[in-house]
Amino acid sequence: IIPENDRPIDLDSLSRWAHSRIDAHIERCTNEALMEWLLNPHRIGDENNLNREEIIEMAHCGIDLHLEEVRNCHSNLNMEELQKWRKGGQRGTFPAPDGFANSGEHIPPEISTGSITWSEAWAIARPWFVDPDAPPFSMQTIHPEQWFQGEYDLVYRWNGKIRIIDLKASVGNNDRSRLYSEQLRLYSWLWWETHDRGDIVDGLEIWYLGPGKRKIVDSPDEKELIRISKEMKEIYETLGNINSEDDAPLNPSPIHYFEEGGIQIGIADNPVERCKTCPYVALCPQGGHDASLPNHKTA
């Protein structure tokens, strides 16, 4: 909530206030995340590799991307929707976190008169997001049949459209970007399944916080969602019935090359290029290695 005395008169003053929140919270949040990581017995890496300046830069990029949403809201929200918001009323299902109760009557403290103000645009554009202080896995969305779950980072709904945003603390220039688009399409499917197959997501985006770039992902239509549902159920049933290596033949996907922002620029010529750096190559039946141990040794 923007304090009344700090309410901005233009986008520049709103931007200064928003970015100042990073300075106020980044050190505490980083230290808490680091402590949580240190307590994880399965952690990988070295705390000395933590680049605090990089974290700060990515946080500022995230604020800039959200401010684009606020600017669009300020420019495009029609007066009818603005007046409806100003009247307040009963909270909707899963409202955007704003420090107030999630149910009951709610009158927005930012309401004004006349044309939309920047503090109103900030409040209206606020997305639903995962509570950073919530316990792990406590904000997962679960398939009605309880065999699939996922966690949305941001859900924007200010213009009546549903858009799911996935945040990536990366530049987006490596092979991991290959799966990010499919991950988002699965989120779209999960939303559809958990809304009685009635709500279809209107937009999907990946926000790469390294360069501060958006990547637009095509949102599946109803026909595609039905196909995804069938494929996912088949995969789930297959995973539950694997009894030997023959039931899950190894077929590594080729390495894909990307430039920043998750833009694909090529595919490796060697179809098994990723096998060169796979940590499980010594155990793989097709890895070309003998993983057997001497009789007097144990793994």
Q: Where are the language model's segments positioned?
A:
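Gly/serine-rich nucleotide phosphate-binding loop at the start of the catalytic core
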Residues: I1
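Catalytic cores of nuclease domains that cleave nucleic-acid phosphodiester backbones
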Residues: E4-I164, R197-D202
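Long, highly charged amphipathic alpha-helices
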Residues: M58-C61, L65, L186, K230-T238
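Metal-dependent nuclease catalytic regions and adjoining charged, substrate-binding loops involved
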Residues: V130, P144-W147, R176-S177, W191-A299
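Short connector loops/turns at beta-strand edges and beta->alpha or beta->beta junctions
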Residues: K161, S170, L209-G212
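Short beta-strand-loop-alpha-helix junction that forms the active-site gateway
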Residues: L167-R176
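An active-site-proximal "capping" alpha-helix that borders the catalytic cofactor pocket
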Residues: S181-E193
